[in-house]
Amino acid sequence: MLLLQFDWNPITGIDIFGNFKLHFYSVMWIVAFLLGFQIMKRIFLKEKVNLDYLDPLFIYTVLATMLGARLGHVLFYQSELISQDFFSIFLPFKFKGGFEFTGFQGLASHGAAIGIIIGMYLYRRKYKYKSLMWILDRVVISVSSGAVFIRIGNFINSEIIGKITDSPLGVRFVQDYYNKRQIVAETGIENYKEAYAAVTNNPQFQHLLDAVPVRHPAQLYESFCYIFVFLILWFIYQKTNKGQQSGYLFGLFLVLLWTVRFFVEFVKEPQGDEYITMFGLNTGQMLSIPFVLIGLYFMFIYKPKTTN
């Protein structure tokens, strides 16, 4: 069973020039948005909605997702950025410790969810072709597909790692255990990329690799579960009458996605300012509970005042 364990020490992007790097994490976001766009296009065509409304919906969704996710991360998990590196909150650069192009890192799904809801509300105020709930019921299908790739991006970056485990599914996250300065110091290799590669490829540094603990690949657990969240939503939308019940898909999305998040948190390491409450639950779990309750409300109690 140990054959299922593996070491994770990848390149995380492609150097363009200077301090600019194309991060694979950013590529995963692009894939998520483009896939979501195609899913929404298919929905618009199926329901004979004017495609002129699709491009602005895409723009609102991208902006709302990125702003909400970034602000959510800062408020919930990394509040020290407000005083220590304020401009990095809004820009794809970090300035503390030297200028570096990082892409948009540090993005929280709870913040993204809130941002999307607000963004769709603002979009609906300008484009009144359907109700807000109609839009939310369909946008969440795209969002659930995108979540699959975002967690793959987290895995590539060796972030949102799991707790130490003896599970046969465990992974050794080399780049989480050793930061760039540490790996250069430990190996004596000046180029940190070559230093990382040497840890897994050069027997001389086997002791450094052996020191890395085996952890749950929590990102992959989530990504795998989100595949089923998407498939369930898509099936209900396409094949059942529930897909036309106002608020049902939106509510089901909240229940499924945040239930997955709640349980995966048990095998995740705390992030940033994350804390454990008196109930033994962490920040991510406490933030997930209201979303599940709201989802149940929309599934079983909500009655629209008007229908489109």
Q: What is the meaning of each model-derived region?
A:
Residues M1-N308:
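Hydrophobic, membrane-interfacing alpha helices
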